[in-house]
Design a protein with these regions (language model features):
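Bacterial N-terminal signal peptides that target proteins for export
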Residues: 2-11
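N-terminal signal peptide c-region/cleavage motif recognized by signal peptidases
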Residues: 19-21
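Amphipathic beta-strand/beta-sheet edge segments enriched in Tyr/Trp
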Residues: 27-36, 191-239, 336-342
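N-terminal segment of the mature soluble domain
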Residues: 47-73, 121, 125-182, 196, ...
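Signal peptide-directed extracytoplasmic domains
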Residues: 67-129, 136-137
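A short, hydrophobic beta-strand-centered structural micro-motif
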Residues: 78-85, 126, 165-213, 318, ...
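Acidic, glycine-rich low-complexity/disordered segments
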Residues: 133-135, 238-261, 267-268
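C-terminal soluble interaction/assembly domains
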Residues: 224, 260-342
């Protein structure tokens, strides 16, 4: 493919995901993996696992077959790494690895492995817990019960591994009281819609129905015992969530069989820095095969691009970028007008 010529631990990632939905659904750290170094694990093993996670992210599938397809084609994992560093955070060692986007895309193309762009779904988790003893409550990003802390940590891990956004609401006491009040006329789902932007809401209610029994209803149906409730609930919850993520990502696959040319007009470029930033942004669009600059006039860049995938995939990548504002497309859907957001 021809283009323009030329950290964080899980808790920190959790803060980023929860505190800034203004970035839309563009997963701009897609090619950077942070991996916890387990006790007794050497650097090479950690790098290999980081590579595997990178392939899972980019393909949208957690099946190891894509990893082995790449390795069996004569590629070494280390060839895809541009740099890595090791950091100690609160007594825990992490390896931060950055991967070569261009080489990965070319390899996926050569081996016909499905690829997912940076446009990633946002999941809102609304989980109500009623243990029959205390007042019912909604698990939020700040709630601190044992189950809540386990959920927060594992949600962050899953979001990082799959390259998606998984959000718990930020409810204060008034929010919870409003939602749980029988006199509150707005359904909880409507209340969330008024406060958050997301692609899919997963609403679950967990109720203790007996001394040794819990009922899980809504987006997940299950009957669980009390003895190992936290473990069993987390198991069925994350199995369900992982399936939902796989289904959503599968719908975002960029097809190599569809190869299209489009004209781009990018306005509001007022400096050399703006121009360089635009180049980097276009360079980062997954599925872009070639870019030809035609002219620059009146603070507007005119170029031709070749893109693997349908127009809808390209428009999603543009529309969900923090620095690009999609203005319109022509009637024939061959001309795309964009504005650079300062």
């Amino acid at each position: 493919m021809n283009y323009f010529s030329n950290n964080i631990n899980y808790i920190f990632l959790l803060i980023i995901i929860f505190s800034n939905l203004s970035f839309g659904k563009e997963f701009d750290q897609l090619f950077k993996i942070n991996h916890k170094i387990e006790s007794g694990q050497n650097i090479d093993t950690s790098l290999n696992r980081s590579f595997d996670d990178m392939i899972y992210r980019l393909s949208g599938s957690t099946k190891p077959s894509n990893v082995w397809k790449i390795i069996n084609a004569g590629n070494a994992r280390k060839d895809f790494i541009t740099k890595y560093s090791i950091k100690n955070i609160s007594g825990t060692s992490y390896i931060f690895t950055e991967f070569n986007q261009t080489l990965l895309e070319q390899t996926f193309f050569d081996l016909n492995i499905p690829i997912i762009g940076k446009s990633r779904p946002v999941y809102m988790i609304m989980l109500e817990v009623d243990d029959g003893l205390n007042s019912p409550y909604f698990v939020s990003e700040t709630s601190s019960n044992n189950l809540d802390r386990l959920l927060q940590s594992q949600i962050s891990e899953l979001a990082s591994k799959r390259g998606v956004f998984i959000v718990l609401p930020s409810f204060d006491l008034k929010d919870s009281e409003n939602i749980l009040s029988y006199n509150y006329l707005v359904e909880p789902e409507k209340y969330l819609e008024s406060k958050y932007d997301y692609d899919q809401l997963i609403s679950i209610k967990v109720i203790k129905t007996g001394i040794n029994e819990w009922k899980v209803a809504g987006g997940l149906e299950a009957m669980l015992g009390s003895k190992n409730f936290n473990r069993d609930f987390l198991n069925v919850f994350f199995n369900m969530l992982d399936r939902e993520v796989s289904t959503s990502l599968n719908l975002k696959t960029i097809s190599y069989e569809s190869n299209n040319n489009f004209s781009l007009k990018i306005a509001n470029i007022n400096s050399v820095n703006d121009y360089e930033k635009i180049k980097d942004l276009l360079f980062g669009i997954i599925g872009l095969n070639n870019i030809k600059i035609n002219k620059f006039s009146n603070n507007t860049l005119f170029c031709e691009i070749n893109f693997y995938g349908k127009l809808g995939s390209l428009l999603q990548e543009i529309d969900e970028n923090s620095y690009l504002n999609l203005l319109n497309t022509s009637d024939l859907e061959e001309d795309i007008s964009i504005e650079y957001k300062l």
